[in-house]
């Protein structure tokens, strides 16, 4: 009796344990990591149905999905990351993501979406990152993103937008609208007070409205490259906290005046490449005392004496010049094509100058200079009753350039919410945040119950070393990835590799996703003799934030011409050499055909005349010469040959098969003879 009463509970417990273990991985997917499902390159038009309910990360990119059925995400309340990129999705039903109450990352890049409605992202109260780039979005309803009050990143590049609705996103840190067709942005359209990075490249902007950036007090990274700006926008002067400014590709800008960029003392990276500049302001040191990266390639520089300061300034201030091999002189003719950094002072054609040096005569004792522990240059004490004496020196050497003093004060209002600014060990400012706030600029409040991993720590880790890139062939570059295999304490999900051609007209960014286990990767299908910028970003597992982006530049080698050159090369340089033999062969073939036809007709006439003299068909002169031999294996000919060759086009058949040595390789291709 006792054993019978215990049997049903034991069976019930066994069934429960087996039921929990049967919960497997969806077909065509991988579940190697806990609470993570990878369905990469799975061929299916719908979302897999049998996803475990405790899944935190679901990756179903490049699956061929065309539609999202209502209820396809039901039963996944703990899902935090959903990757639906590189599919064929054309529309999103209203409320399709509403069951995903804990979703924080949604990637819909590279689909075929046309519209975003007010109901598309309903219920996603915890969403922090939304990627909608490389779609066909033409219309976004006003208020489509208003409910996403926790959104930190919104990416809409490479779409077909013509009008942008007002955006009210108080916590947004990154907004990417690049490569749409939005020729104008009205003032007040961006209600994003905390945005740090704003990318407006390739919109077709002709000007920037004066009030466009009025509320963006936290803006540090501005990209307005590849637009149609005709002059430096004056609205940029008010962005005192700007550290990175990209103006490349605005080919109508022909001049930069010092007052155009006045007040940007915090600027560290400036990109003015591919403009129409013939010179640069000589007081860049005072304008940008913290500048460490300058891109000025593909400008028609006039390398005369007013530009002689550039090379010494770059070297003395340790400024990194991006793409120095493309920063060349266009004028005057003697310097055309030369690298700007390779020119000496005398190469700029500066006249022999008479320099008046002021030599102070000191009556009092000169004390030793006071050395400061800061990065500022040593200062000399004031001198007592100095008198000056002028001495004239004839010199052709460049004027001595004093290094720019390092500023000791931080930009105004750079730290938010009461944070204090200070200079770090490398003379880069950093913010000390008060209790209750966090972030690089103290921009994010620490909320109760919020995980610290969702907000970047302060200060940020030091940037990675530059990438190691080496050329493999004229169309490929090899990127070394060993750094992500050795000594990495963060569990990596994958690597994101992006590259773009800096030399050609198409500068669109190409994005690849690589496994984290690769030691190196070869980027193929590149253009020869071109400069490429390649960046790699490690992607952490789960909710771990992205690592620092490591970038580098490399050149593909020159294409080598050989005896086995492809057809595309022969079209450019060797086209006449190929046409001349072909024309000669055609001419010889025509002459040979005409001569043979003439002989056949004359022989036929002779044979007709001899028929009256009882001469048999087998003893004709054409048969003795062997002209009729090719007719036997060819088309059906009569024994006499006279009927088959009389009149009509049949007489041309033996000419096509005539075994002439000079025309053997040409005649088969000439079917029109």
Swiss-Prot record:
PTM per Swiss-Prot/TrEMBL: N-glycosylated.
Top-level taxon of the source organism: Eukaryota
Region (Disordered): 369-389, 608-648
Occurrences of domain Fibronectin type-III (ranges): 463-559
Signal peptide coordinates: 1-24
A GO term, aspect molecular function: transforming growth factor beta binding
A single GO BP: cellular response to hypoxia
Polar residues: compositionally biased ranges: 370-389
Residues with attached carbohydrate: 102, 118, 274, 501, 529, 555
Assembly with partners or alone: Interacts with TGFB1, TGFB2 and TGFB3.
Subcellular location(s) of the protein: Membrane
Keyword terms: Disulfide bond, EGF-like domain, Glycoprotein, Leucine-rich repeat, Membrane, Repeat, Signal, Transmembrane, Transmembrane helix
Induction: Upon retinoic acid-induced differentiation of smooth muscle cells in vitro.
PANTHER family attached to this UniProt entry: ANTIGEN BSP, PUTATIVE-RELATED (PTHR24369), VASORIN (PTHR24369:SF160)
Extent of the LRR repeats: 54-75, 78-99, 102-123, 126-147, 150-170, 171-192, 194-215, 218-239, 241-265, 266-288
Cellular compartments per GO CC: cell surface; extracellular exosome; mitochondrion; plasma membrane
Extracellular side: 25-576
Record's protein name: Vasorin
Major subcellular location class: membrane
Disulphide bonds in the chain: 410-421, 415-431, 433-442
Organism: Mus musculus
Positions in the Cytoplasmic compartment: 598-673
């Amino acid at each position: 009796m006792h054993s019978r009463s215990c049997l049903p509970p034991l069976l019930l417990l066994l069934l429960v344990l087996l039921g929990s273990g049967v919960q497997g991985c969806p077909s065509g997917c991988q579940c190697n990591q806990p609470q993570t499902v990878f369905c990469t390159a799975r061929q299916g038009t719908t979302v897999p149905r049998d996803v475990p309910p405790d899944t935190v990360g679901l990756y179903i990119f490049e699956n061929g999905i065309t539609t999202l059925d209502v209820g396809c995400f039901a039963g996944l309340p703990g899902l935090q990351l959903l990757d639906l990129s590189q599919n064929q999705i054309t529309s999103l039903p209203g409320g399709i993501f509403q069951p995903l109450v804990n979703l924080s990352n949604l990637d819909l890049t590279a689909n075929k979406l046309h519209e975003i409605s007010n109901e598309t992202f309903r219920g996603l109260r915890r969403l922090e990152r939304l990627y909608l780039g490389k779609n066909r979005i033409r219309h976004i309803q006003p208020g489509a993103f208003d409910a996403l009050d926790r959104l930190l990143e919104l990416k809409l590049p490479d779409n077909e937008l013509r009008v942008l609705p007002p955006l009210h996103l108080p916590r947004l840190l990154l907004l990417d609208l690049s490569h749409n067709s939005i020729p104008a942005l009205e003032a007040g359209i961006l209600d994003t007070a905390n945005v740090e990075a704003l990318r407006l490249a390739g919109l077709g902007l002709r000007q920037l409205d004066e009030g466009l950036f009025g509320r963006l007090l936290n803006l540090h990274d501005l990209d307005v490259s590849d637009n149609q700006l005709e002059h430096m926008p004056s609205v940029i002067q008010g962005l005192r906290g700007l550290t990175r400014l990209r103006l490349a590709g605005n080919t109508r800008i022909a001049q930069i005046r010092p007052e155009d960029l006045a007040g940007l003392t915090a600027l560290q990276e400036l990109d003015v490449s591919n403009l129409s500049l013939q010179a640069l302001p000589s007081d860049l040191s005072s304008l940008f005392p913290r500048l460490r990266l300058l891109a000025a390639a593909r400008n028609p520089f006039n390398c005369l004496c007013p530009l002689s300061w550039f090379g010494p300034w770059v070297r003395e201030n340790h400024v990194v010049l991006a793409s120095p091999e493309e920063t060349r002189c266009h004028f005057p003719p003697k310097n055309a094509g030369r690298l700007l950094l390779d020119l000496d002072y005398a190469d700029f054609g500066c006249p022999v100058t008479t320099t008046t040096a002021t030599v102070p005569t000191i009556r009092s004792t000169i004390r030793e200079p006071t050395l400061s522990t800061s990065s500022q240059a040593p200062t000399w004490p004031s001198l007592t009753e100095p008198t000056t004496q002028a001495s004239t020196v004839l010199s052709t050497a460049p004027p001595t350039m004093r290094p720019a003093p390092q500023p000791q004060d931080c930009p105004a209002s750079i730290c938010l919410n009461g944070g204090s600014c200070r200079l770090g060990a490398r003379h880069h400012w950093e913010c000390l945040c008060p209790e209750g706030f966090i972030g690089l600029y103290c921009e994010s409040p620490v909320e109760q119950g919020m995980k610290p991993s969702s907000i970047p720590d302060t200060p940020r880790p030091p940037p990675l070393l530059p990438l190691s890139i080496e050329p493999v062939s004229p169309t490929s570059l090899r990127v070394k990835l060993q750094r992500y295999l050795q000594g990495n304490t963060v569990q990596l999900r994958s690597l994101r590799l992006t590259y773009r051609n800096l030399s050609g007209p198409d500068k669109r960014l190409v994005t690849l996703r690589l496994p984290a286990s690769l030691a190196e990767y070869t980027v193929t299908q590149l253009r020869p003799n071109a400069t490429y910028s390649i960046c790699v970003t490690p992607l952490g597992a789960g909710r771990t934030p992205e690592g620092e982006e490591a970038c580098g530049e490399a050149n593909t080698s020159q294409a080598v011409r050989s005896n086995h050159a492809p057809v595309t090369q022969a079209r450019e340089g060797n086209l006449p050499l190929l046409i001349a033999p072909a024309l000669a062969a055609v001419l010889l073939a025509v002459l040979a055909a005409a001569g043979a036809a003439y002989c056949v007709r004359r022989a036929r006439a002779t044979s007709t005349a001899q028929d009256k003299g009882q001469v048999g068909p087998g003893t004709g002169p054409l048969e003795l010469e062997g002209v009729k031999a090719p007719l036997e294996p060819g088309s059906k000919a009569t024994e006499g040959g006279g009927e088959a060759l009389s009149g009509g086009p049949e007489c041309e058949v033996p000419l096509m098969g005539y075994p002439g040595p000079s025309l053997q390789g040409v005649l088969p291709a000439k079917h029109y003879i």
